Curated annotation (Swiss-Prot):
<comment type="similarity">
    <text>Belongs to the ATP-dependent AMP-binding enzyme family.</text>
</comment>
<feature type="binding site">
    <location>
        <position position="535"/>
    </location>
    <ligand>
        <name>ATP</name>
    </ligand>
</feature>
<feature type="binding site">
    <location>
        <position position="546"/>
    </location>
    <ligand>
        <name>ATP</name>
    </ligand>
</feature>
<dbReference type="Pfam" id="PF16177">
    <property type="entry name" value="ACAS_N"/>
</dbReference>
<feature type="binding site">
    <location>
        <position position="329"/>
    </location>
    <ligand>
        <name>CoA</name>
    </ligand>
</feature>
<keyword id="KW-0547">Nucleotide-binding</keyword>
<feature type="binding site">
    <location>
        <position position="605"/>
    </location>
    <ligand>
        <name>CoA</name>
    </ligand>
</feature>
<dbReference type="InterPro" id="IPR025110">
    <property type="entry name" value="AMP-bd_C"/>
</dbReference>
<protein>
    <recommendedName>
        <fullName>Acetyl-coenzyme A synthetase 1</fullName>
        <ecNumber>6.2.1.1</ecNumber>
    </recommendedName>
</protein>
<feature type="binding site">
    <location>
        <begin position="210"/>
        <end position="213"/>
    </location>
    <ligand>
        <name>CoA</name>
    </ligand>
</feature>
<dbReference type="Pfam" id="PF13193">
    <property type="entry name" value="AMP-binding_C"/>
</dbReference>
<dbReference type="InterPro" id="IPR045851">
    <property type="entry name" value="AMP-bd_C_sf"/>
</dbReference>
<dbReference type="GO" id="GO:0019427">
    <property type="term" value="P:acetyl-CoA biosynthetic process from acetate"/>
</dbReference>
<dbReference type="InterPro" id="IPR011904">
    <property type="entry name" value="Ac_CoA_lig"/>
</dbReference>
<dbReference type="GO" id="GO:0016208">
    <property type="term" value="F:AMP binding"/>
</dbReference>
<dbReference type="GO" id="GO:0003987">
    <property type="term" value="F:acetate-CoA ligase activity"/>
</dbReference>
<dbReference type="GO" id="GO:0005829">
    <property type="term" value="C:cytosol"/>
</dbReference>
Length: 671
């Protein structure tokens, strides 16, 4: 063991090979033949990125004007050296909308592009590629008529309905830039993002539906626009048809009325490879919003390649990503990735628990979903509900099960594998970021061996390095722990923070010179598999021991009574920091709570060691989470620090009411 070794890599299960049934369930030949093919391609993507990605770009994308060279500079030796990011597909021109829609509409106009499952059961519709093209073209004409031109920003505040996809594709069809704001953000957060992106138009709905509840979407927009004088129009889709929705004459326009004015075709506007495609503001940040900017060609290639290789997507597949278009997962694996591959994408408006815990599995069987992609948070919820909600479903169309958003605990991995995959699907635990645009670490479906809890191996072009967090020295051997960085540029990397490139350099390129800094701790085990240990600011330093919160959480969840947990650090006079564990128990627990606390401490001592023992265990009803499923550890830290008045905007939480209960629990421990 090296001085930087990590306990999380002590995997007792060994390497799990892809199931033999994976290939049997596929209607098409797998996109990669074997692991040797991946290894050869990966090596070339690192050693000769210009040649590798040049060939991939010609294979996966249609070009209006061919690029002169795939990468400038051709060599990656000086990447990130002076805050510079390589340019990709120099002098090439293309259009994202054409690549995602037109070429498939021409080939097979009657093929389903979007399957829409509404919040209400048995409501929804199927949109073919031919119909999608018509809708996109009509909206593109509408936006042009309203004065939107190439490079302009359009704010999108829409729920998970097909019109969200139509909107994004129409915006990029005319060379404009979409800035999607998750339709759960408060009016204040929406206002900040509209102002920062200088958006001229907002596209939204009268109301939205989620989990059986009606959300007053338009009222939130109206409140935000009180302080956005440069917004000229609001385009309003009629989702519920509430006749009492506020409507501002001269500014507000009805979607259906505007769409009826235009014909079924509008030519796509070619843009340069490096022209911006979209802005997406990262969630959970404090202070000024951080608008991550992505380029057109590089992002599209990343979305297409990772969909094809990570998920083994083919044109005859149906991909169900249980994510929202307001986050990067929705952008890449609900919208662009599946459509760039000519597949069918499922757009689900609801929640996994409405009207009951069978909703996901009902959708899978109903539409013969082949790839399912979801956050571990949802899986924990469904595991707690019990297998009775799964037993009546075949789920035999599935061949790939994806996990996204946070590391998946081994216990949840096995539950997923046994109950949803029936041990016949390949589980791909993916690691990536808003800033990366597409997968960074992930198994490739049907190809890569896996270990429960590990993100496996780097994707093409990701020259992953683990650095010593203090010295910045690369830890080249296996069985090491440090910070995860990337040595060279890849096509889908963010091109910066909108209007603040200096902040981009400070955040991602300056901490470890000549590297992109992910912000995450990671380990590479004895077999070369990568494990994500959580954000570096989620690492707790107790008496000189650097403890990964993810590692402690993985130990706690082994206890049979634990449904969810989150570990954070807090100030301690003796040890510098101490470990606090917020624990949510399963609903059927009858055991004495003090006994459970003692058992949890023993579990951590057994799995990791005495130095990792939580000093405080707080039993709470639930944990604060965003709608995308991420646990908001920032809130948990602030409550522990007695900073309840500095929590910021909690309106984006899926369960904001839980914060008050958590505050009460913490206060009770101080008495």
């Amino acid at each position: 063991m090296t001085p930087h070794s990590t306990h999380v890599t002590l995997d007792h299960e060994g390497i799990i090979q892809p199931p033999a049934e994976f290939k049997e369930r596929s209607k098409s030949k797998p996109n990669l033949a074997d692991f040797e093919t991946y290894s050869k391609m990966y090596k070339e993507s690192i050693e000769n990125p210009s040649k590798f990605f040049g060939e991939q770009a010609l294979e996966h994308l249609s070009w209006d004007r061919p690029f002169d060279e795939a990468r400038y500079p051709v060599s990656s030796e000086q990447d990130f050296a002076d805050g510079d990011i390589a340019s990709w597909f120099v002098n090439g021109q293309l259009n994202a909308s054409y690549n995602a829609v037109d070429r498939w509409a021409i080939k097979n106009p009657n093929k389903p592009a979007i399957i829409y499952e509404a919040d209400e059961e048995n409501e929804g519709r199927i949109i073919t590629y031919g119909q999608l093209l018509k809708d996109v073209c009509k909206l593109a004409q509408c936006l042009t008529k309203l004065g939107i031109r190439k490079g302009d920003s359009v704010a999108v505040y829409l729920p998970m309905i097909p019109e969200a996809l139509v909107t994004l594709l129409a915006i990029v069809r005319i060379g404009a830039v979409h800035s999607v704001v998750f339709a759960g953000f408060s009016s204040s957060s929406l206002k900040d993002r509209i102002l920062d992106a200088s958006s001229k138009i907002v596209i939204t709905t009268d109301e939205s539906k989620r989990g059986g509840k009606t959300i007053e979407t338009k009222k939130i927009v109206d409140d935000a626009l009180k302080n956005c004088p440069d917004v000229t129009n609001v385009l309003l889709f009629k989702r519920t048809g509430n006749a009492h929705i506020p409507f501002t004459e001269g500014r507000d326009l009805w979607w259906h009325e505007e769409m009826a004015k235009y014909g079924p075709y509008f030519p796509p506007v070619p843009v340069n490879s490096e022209d911006p495609l979209f802005l997406l503001y990262t969630s959970g940040s404090t202070g000024k919003p951080k608008g991550i900017q992505h380029s057109t060609a590089g992002y599209l290639l990343g979305a297409a390649m990772t969909s094809k290789y990570t998920f083994d997507v083919h044109e005859d597949d149906v991909l169900f990503t249980a994510g929202d278009v307001g986050w990067i997962t929705g952008h890449t694996y609900v919208v662009y990735g599946p459509l760039l591959c000519g597949a069918t994408t499922v757009v689900f408006e609801g929640t996994p628990a409405h009207p009951n815990y069978s909703r996901y599995w009902e959708i899978v069987d109903k539409y013969q979903v082949t790839q399912f992609y979801v956050a571990p948070t949802a899986l924990r919820l469904l595991k707690r509900a019990g297998t009775k909600y799964i037993e009546n479903y075949k789920l035999d169309s599935l061949r790939v099960l994806g996990s996204v958003g946070e590391p998946i605990a081994a216990e949840i991995w096995h539950w997923y594998n046994d109950n949803i995959g029936r041990r016949k699907c390949h589980i791909v635990d993916t690691y990536w970021q808003t800033e990366s645009g597409s997968h960074m670490l992930a198994p490739l479906a049907g190809i890569t061996p896996t270990k429960p809890g590990s993100a496996s191996l780097p994707c093409f072009g990701i020259d992953a390095k683990i650095l010593d967090p203090v010295s910045g020295k690369e830890l080249k051997e296996n069985d090491v722990e440090g910070v995860l960085c990337v040595k060279s540029c890849w096509p889908s990397i963010s091109r910066g923070i909108y209007n603040d490139y200096a902040r981009f350099i400070e955040t991602y390129l300056k901490p470890y010179p000549n590297h992109y800094f992910s912000g995450d701790g990671a380990a590479r085990d004895v077999d070369g598999f990568y494990w994500i240990l959580g954000r570096v600011d989620d690492v707790v330093n107790v008496s000189g021991h650097r403890l990964s919160t993810a590692e402690i959480e993985a130990a706690l969840i082994l206890h049979e009574s634990v449904a969810e947990c989150a570990v954070v650090g807090y100030a301690d006079e003796l040890t510098g920091q101490a470990v606090a564990a917020y624990v949510s128990l399963k609903s059927n627990v009858s055991e004495d709570l003090e006994v459970i606390k003692k058992e949890l401490i023993l579990t951590v001592r057994k799995e990791i060691g005495p130095f990792a023992t939580p000093k405080t265990i707080l039993l709470v009803d639930d944990l604060p989470k965003t709608r995308s499923g991420k646990i908001m550890r920032r809130i948990l830290r602030k409550v522990l620090a007695g900073e309840e008045d500095q929590l910021g905007d909690i309106s984006t939480l899926s369960n904001p009411g839980v914060v008050a209960q958590i505050i009460d629990v913490v206060k009770a421990t101080r008495k």
